[in-house]
Design a protein with these regions (language model features):
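Exposed, low-structure sequence patches enriched in small/polar residues
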Residues: 1-270
């Protein structure tokens, strides 16, 4: 069950309270809903959020989510609970220039390695993101994103990770070709501090791969609308790692520090 209450005490401000209850023995293969987990199962929680627009240029948003898992799940072999908080400030001085800065804090529980699930300890994850969107004209638009992660738990050295991504989009006015070029640099200490970098994929698809270690990622996405019926999309991306000489293992082993991917799509609409 999912229940929501929304209240607006004044113009430009509102509060929302969401309660969710997903039984641990509930199964829905393709269901998606609001929650900490990706599946609609084994989760209870309360989420309180609020947004206020003090002026035409500024917007403040804050939320806190208190959740619990009544049954065991990945990396935790007993009932557990946690908290997820978010604070975001958005500044839009002009219609073609917007930016925001947000801070996210998350605390969860995890089994201690080597104890067979008998001992659990809290883990803490701090995330900081800055994003700038700028469109100087109708031809080009730019998006800059900087992320920083900090992860720590009791009895373990803290780790950190960060990434910087620049996206350049070109939309010619009198030519039906849209080009998006994206470049990223990432560095993380370990798997827990991995970074996620969203990329524009094919039509009706989402692509947000995770990266760990040190390296760069470049991708180019081309969309050409031949006419009102035909459309072609092609995407090429390559990841280059600076801290390893091979990628993967077993049958997926790549004896190089480079990994490339190519995607294409043809659509006929009638």
């Amino acid at each position: 069950t999912l229940n929501k209450i929304r209240y607006s005490p004044m113009q430009g401000a509102h509060l929302s309270l969401i309660y969710r209850y997903y039984a641990h023995d509930y199964w829905a293969m393709f269901a998606h809903s609001f929650g900490e987990s990706s599946s609609v199962q084994n989760e209870n929680g309360w989420c309180l959020s609020g947004e206020i627009t003090p002026s035409r240029y500024w917007k403040l948003f804050a939320s806190i989510d208190l959740f619990s898992f009544p049954w065991w799940k990945y990396r935790i072999s007993k009932p557990s609970q946690g908290v997820d908080g978010l604070l975001q400030v958005t500044f839009a001085p002009h219609e073609n220039l917007t930016m925001y800065l947000n801070y996210r804090y998350k605390r969860k529980e995890r089994d201690v390695s080597g104890t067979n699930g008998k001992i659990t300890l809290p883990v803490y994850h701090h995330r900081l993101r800055y994003r700038l969107n700028y469109s100087p004209g109708e031809l080009f638009s730019f998006r800059t994103t900087a992320d920083y992660n900090h992860f720590h738990s009791l009895g373990k050295l803290p780790g950190q990770g960060y990434q910087l991504t620049q996206v350049i989009t070109c939309r010619p006015l009198h030519f039906p070709l849209k080009t998006e070029l994206q470049g990223s640099y990432f560095y993380t200490d370990d798997y827990d501090t991995r970074v996620y970098i969203a990329e524009k994929g094919l039509l009706y698809t989402f692509y947000t791969p995770s990266f760990q270690g040190e390296g760069v990622r470049v991708a180019i996405n081309l969309r050409y609308d031949l006419n009102t019926h035909w459309m072609v999309i092609a995407k090429f991306g390559q990841t280059i790692y600076m801290n390893r000489s091979e990628i993967g293992s077993g049958y997926d082993l790549i004896a190089s520090n480079k990994k490339a991917d190519l995607q294409m799509q043809l659509r006929l609409k009638f």
